[in-house]
Regions:
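Ligand-binding "clamshell"
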Residues: 128-140, 234-248
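Bacterial N-terminal signal peptides
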Residues: 8-19
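Acidic, polar ligand-binding/catalytic clefts
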Residues: 108-166
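Periplasmic-binding protein-like
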Residues: 68, 143-152, 239-277, 287-307
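N-terminal hydrophobic or amphipathic helices and topogenic motifs
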Residues: 10, 23-105, 289-332
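Bilobed "Venus flytrap"/periplasmic-binding protein-like clamshell domains
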Residues: 65-88, 123, 146-214, 221, ...
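A local structural motif
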Residues: 88-99, 191-206, 242-244, 321, ...
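Short helices/loops that flank or line small-molecule/ion binding pockets
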Residues: 104-118, 131, 165, 209-229
């Protein structure tokens, strides 16, 4: 099956006309935990269960796939081409790659039923699970286990910033409101280092991790918290040298991007998608770009994202609609 690459929400909405409908509220739900009112979690695994009404299950002829916009989306559209072709053959579905421009757009697309399978940034995963009915099931990794990452705080080599305490009064770029390493972790962790983001320095949102890193190199920003994955990839690609910057802070490890399916796909289709992921072996290009990862591994969102959820709570940014709207209003 061939994959089709579309870059606009207009094209994506056209796909939705082919069989997707908006998610309906689970009025007869006995327990939904932290999930939005559209979803139900009676088995207490912190993700939305399939609708009780089988008439609401979806088996679309076209599957829409998107990957988190942590960098220029075009990079990943090409990178995932081999995989989306494999997914199309495996499921016997037409695959549309949706080039999303923001985490918020990706979450809204899945919430509205226009996105079926997605690679989600670590911090975005909780929002997508609670607000969009995303069911995380996989993570990148290799024979040694799943990919983990750290939050780095990066400054220009010549900068006089040596510690987190030196960020007071400086121009510091965060990435996006839902980003774990680019926003939520700094809110939760920096106060222990004597600095409160938004109080001791004004938060400027760059939009993406690569834009934060580029901004530091161009001296648009004096410092930026980013994911170690992007930092390492830039060095691997030759986009910068290791001694162009200094890392003044390294956090503990977090799980990297998850892969999730929409909660209302038919169980047969959802299982087929998961099996496809776990059977797939990364192309040489993917292995290089993902720093040696060569496979997808299963994850348990309740257990494996406990630390990330804890960071969100500690930062005062719970995974709910009110906070999501509040933070995105700040970004605008």
């Amino acid at each position: 099956m061939r994959s089709v690459y579309l870059a606009s929400a207009v094209a994506l909405s056209l796909v939705s006309m082919l069989g997707s409908t908006a998610v309906h509220a689970a009025d007869d739900c006995k327990s939904r935990g932290e999930l939005d009112t559209n979803y139900c979690d009676e088995d207490n695994n912190l993700v939305a269960q399939a609708p009780k009404d089988k008439a609401k299950w979806k088996d679309p002829s076209t599957l829409v796939f998107a990957y988190t916009p942590i960098e220029d989306p075009a990079v990943y559209a090409n990178l995932f081409k081999d995989f989306t072709e494999y997914l199309g053959t495996y499921t016997q579905k037409k695959i549309v790659y949706y080039t999303v421009q923001s985490n918020a757009a990706q979450i809204e697309a899945m919430r509205s039923g226009r996105l079926h399978v997605a690679g989600l940034a670590s911090g975005e995963t909780g929002l997508a699970a609670n607000l969009a009915g995303a069911v995380p099931f996989a993570i990148k990794g290799n024979k040694d286990g799943p990919r983990m990452y750290r939050q780095f705080v990066v400054v220009k080599k010549e900068s006089n910033i040596k510690t987190i305490a030196d960020l007071k009064g400086r121009k510091v770029a965060h990435t996006a409101p839902s980003s774990n390493s680019g926003h939520l972790a700094p809110l939760a962790l920096f106060p222990k280092e004597g600095v409160t983001p938004g109080k001791d320095y004004n938060i400027v949102f760059s939009g993406k991790h690569d834009q934060s890193l580029a901004g530091v190199l161009k001296e648009d920003y004096e410092a930026a918290p980013i994911t170690s994955d992007i930092y390492d990839r830039w060095i691997m690609r030759g986009q910068m040298k290791a001694d162009d910057t200094r890392i003044i802070y390294r956090s503990g490890t977090f799980p990297t991007s998850s892969f999730a399916h929409a909660h209302d796909l038919t169980p047969v289709l959802a299982d087929k998608i998961k099996k496809c992921f776990f059977d797939y072996k990364f192309s040489p290009e993917m292995q290089k770009e993902f720093l040696g990862d060569d496979r997808f591994l299963p994850v348990d969102y309740k257990k494996d994202w406990k630390l990330v959820r804890g960071v969100a709570l500690a930062s005062g940014t719970p995974y709910n609609r009110a906070q999501f709207d509040k933070e995105n209003a700040k970004k605008k």
